[in-house]
UniProtKB/Swiss-Prot annotation:
<keyword id="KW-0472">Membrane</keyword>
<keyword id="KW-0812">Transmembrane</keyword>
<dbReference type="InterPro" id="IPR006461">
    <property type="entry name" value="PLAC_motif_containing"/>
</dbReference>
<comment type="similarity">
    <text>Belongs to the cornifelin family.</text>
</comment>
<keyword id="KW-1133">Transmembrane helix</keyword>
<protein>
    <recommendedName>
        <fullName>Protein PLANT CADMIUM RESISTANCE 12</fullName>
    </recommendedName>
</protein>
<dbReference type="GO" id="GO:0016020">
    <property type="term" value="C:membrane"/>
</dbReference>
<dbReference type="Pfam" id="PF04749">
    <property type="entry name" value="PLAC8"/>
</dbReference>
<comment type="function">
    <text>May be involved in heavy metals transport.</text>
</comment>
<feature type="transmembrane region" description="Helical">
    <location>
        <begin position="71"/>
        <end position="89"/>
    </location>
</feature>
Length: 161
């Protein structure tokens, strides 16, 4: 078992036993907070519909346990009263934990309080750079990883033997 969820298998072996599609260093962000220009699609989507980009990230970071639609609606509702950052910053913390990323450029709640769109874009790019495509959802990513016989990029440090 991996955490509380199932072990993902490809031809009888656990994904934990397979190499990563791309070995990216833990402890380093692959993209900066203000590097929105690196992915125009994510940038435009987040500028127009931040709740959609955020919800896609939530589904991946939480390994499909929080449906995209639910996360998006909650983010949208909280956005109307200016509090979406309260729901968003814990997801950034989870993402950082998965990849042992530093809390930069400041505390997660401050990043989301003062720059939610930039934070959402950075988190989307980080997932994409590490092999997860937030736009296709968790199950489609799992199917893709199974076909390619690679380890899912979502790994909690200390959980692998």
């Amino acid at each position: 078992m991996y955490g509380n969820g199932p072990v993902f298998k490809a031809e009888g072996t656990s994904f934990r036993d397979q190499p990563y599609a791309e070995q990216l260093p833990q402890g380093l962000w692959t993209t900066g907070l203000c590097d929105c220009h690196e992915d125009a699609h994510i940038c435009v989507q987040t500028a127009i519909m931040p709740c959609v980009s955020f919800a896609q990230n939530v589904e991946i970071v939480n390994r499909g346990t929080i449906p995209c639609m639910n996360a998006g609606l909650i983010h949208l509702a909280l956005g109307f009263i200016g509090c979406s950052w309260l729901y968003a910053f814990p997801n950034r913390s989870r993402l950082r934990e998965h990849f042992a990323l530093p809390e930069e450029p400041c505390r997660d709640f401050l990043v989301h309080l003062f720059c939610t769109p930039c934070a959402i874009c950075q988190e989307s790019r980080e997932l994409k750079n590490r092999g997860a495509d937030p736009s296709i959802g968790w199950l489609s990513n799992v199917e893709k990883w199974s076909r390619e016989k690679v380890t899912p990029p979502i790994v909690v440090p200390g959980m692998i033997r």
